[in-house]
Amino acid sequence: MTETHTTGVRGDSGRETAELVASRVLDVPDFPKPGVMFKDLMPLFSDGDAFREVIDDIVRYHGRDSFDTVVGIEARGFVVAAAIAYAAGVGVVPVRKAGKLPRVAYSASYALEYGEATLEVHQDAFTAGHRVLVVDDVLATGGTAEATLDLVERAGGTVAGFTVLLELGFLGGRERLTPRPVHALLTV
């Protein structure tokens, strides 16, 4: 395991925040399969001061009054979403893998490298016009994010923003989400 290199880092919240995130990301080779370099954000989550700084930065960036609810994408997005919701004094809604929610839900499927996955959100998660900040830990190809943004809108919410801690820019997720704006604290 190695630390993500911090020289030449960039992010939508500025160099200082990007460097903070980069300094707490570990590269794990060949996980979850050979040839993949997994970006482990657990060191950031476990560093209370750094995690608080990142969460405060996200709330400042979007503005405390610009969203009514935070949506977290399963699973690490739950960690980020709950912290942002607490800091902003709003509620949190999970977007889960298929079959994990107990009530009637909307579902959206998206392509994986070998197959398909489905996400769900409760149909009564939002009222019409509810402003929703969607967050996840990592943006890769954008399939999960695109499905989640579509689910929020189908459930009556208005996407107020989309934020990730880490964007793997070379995989094109940001472009896939156009014209929706993407806020990434660190882009590699």
From Swiss-Prot:
Annotated Gene Ontology cellular components are:
cytoplasm
Q: Which reaction does it catalyse?
A: AMP + diphosphate = 5-phospho-alpha-D-ribose 1-diphosphate + adenine
- What keywords is this UniProt entry annotated with? Cytoplasm, Glycosyltransferase, Purine salvage, Transferase
GO BP: any one term: adenine salvage
Gene Ontology terms, MF aspect: adenine binding; adenine phosphoribosyltransferase activity; AMP binding
Pathway, according to UniProt?
Purine metabolism; AMP biosynthesis via salvage pathway; AMP from adenine: step 1/1
Q: What is its EC number?
A: 2.4.2.7
Q: Which domain of life is it from?
A: Bacteria
What InterPro entries does UniProt report for this protein, alphabetically?
Ade_phspho_trans, PRibTrfase_dom, PRTase-like, UPRTase/APRTase
Localization, per the record, is: Cytoplasm
The record's comment on protein family reads: Belongs to the purine/pyrimidine phosphoribosyltransferase family.
Protein task:
Catalyzes a salvage reaction resulting in the formation of AMP, that is energically less costly than de novo synthesis.
**Self-association or partners: how does it assemble?**
Homodimer.
Designated name of the protein: Adenine phosphoribosyltransferase
Tell me the organism: Salinispora tropica (strain ATCC BAA-916 / DSM 44818 / JCM 13857 / NBRC 105044 / CNB-440)
The UniProt gene name for this protein comes to: apt
